[in-house]
A protein has these predicted regions:
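Alpha/beta catalytic cores of nucleotide-metabolism and tRNA/nucleoside-modifying enzymes
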Residues: 100-191
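Single conserved hydrophobic/aromatic residue that forms the stacking wall/gate
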Residues: 189-199
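Second-shell residues forming the walls of enzyme active-site clefts
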Residues: 81, 94-102
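Generic beta-strand/beta-sheet core signal
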Residues: 63-65, 84-87, 116-118, 140-141
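Glycine-rich, proline-tolerant flexible connector loops at the mouths of alpha/beta enzymes
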Residues: 86-93, 148
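Active-site entrance/lid segments in N-terminal catalytic domains of soluble metabolic enzymes
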Residues: 1-76, 88-91, 100
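Glycine-enriched alpha-helix->loop->beta-strand junction motifs that scaffold or abut catalytic
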Residues: 56-58, 76-81, 109-112, 134-137
Length: 199
């Protein structure tokens, strides 16, 4: 493939702004698994997060919250937002999806902190479901990164436009005129528990 020819014949890929700080900014080969293993700092703890939140002095959100217990800790240390996220399932593909515990986290802390559903959002209908459960917002890297890589800013604007169009169309089909009208009664589950699979 062409990428192989380019790899051999073109100048080596480098990120000069990072190469003095991390080896991942150089042309040193590394596996994705090794890269992410080195990124995970096991020494980070709740006291560190509380100190960061305090020093920041403004809105502060933690990403990677996957349990009610951690959501409550985030409230206790002064976070103003949390991102319910399993980081796209890349590191632990057997982990629950963010949507699977969104309802219980919203029920526990949604009146005290902004809960953002991050990950697995691939369509406007996914945003519609997360907002109906009680998320204040939705987020995702793939939402815009693929569009950015393929078509730059215009691609991102087009992708976001598709999400918005789908969200607005489906809200109209549901008879909702405002995001504020979305709630769990808008959803139909296969069993009484909101943590179970949607139809």
């Amino acid at each position: 493939p062409m990428w192989g020819i380019n790899y051999l014949t073109k100048p080596k890929f480098e990120l000069p702004q990072l190469q003095d700080h991390v080896s991942e900014g150089t042309n040193t080969a590394t596996s994705i698994g090794s890269y992410f293993t080195t990124m995970l700092d096991q020494s980070m703890n709740w006291k560190d997060a509380e100190r960061l939140s305090s020093k920041w002095g403004g809105h502060f959100a933690l990403k990677g919250i996957m349990s009610v217990e951690d959501a409550k800790k985030a409230v206790d240390i002064g976070c103003t937002g949390i991102m319910v996220s399993n980081h796209g399932g890349r590191q632990l593909d057997g982990a629950r999806a963010p949507f699977d515990q969104l309802a219980e986290i919203v029920d526990a802390v949604g009146d005290k902190i902004d809960v953002i559903c991050e990950g697995g959002i691939q369509r406007g209908t996914h945003m519609l479901k997360a907002l109906s459960v009680g998320a204040k917002a939705c987020s995702g890297g793939r939402l815009y990164l693929y569009a950015l890589a393929s078509a730059g800013q215009e691609g991102v604007e087009k992708a976001l436009g598709i999400y918005r169009t789908e969200l607005e169309r489906d809200m109209k089909l549901m008879g909702c005129k405002s995001i504020k009208e979305l709630n769990r009664s808008c959803l139909l589950y296969t069993s009484p528990s909101p943590r179970d699979t949607l139809l």
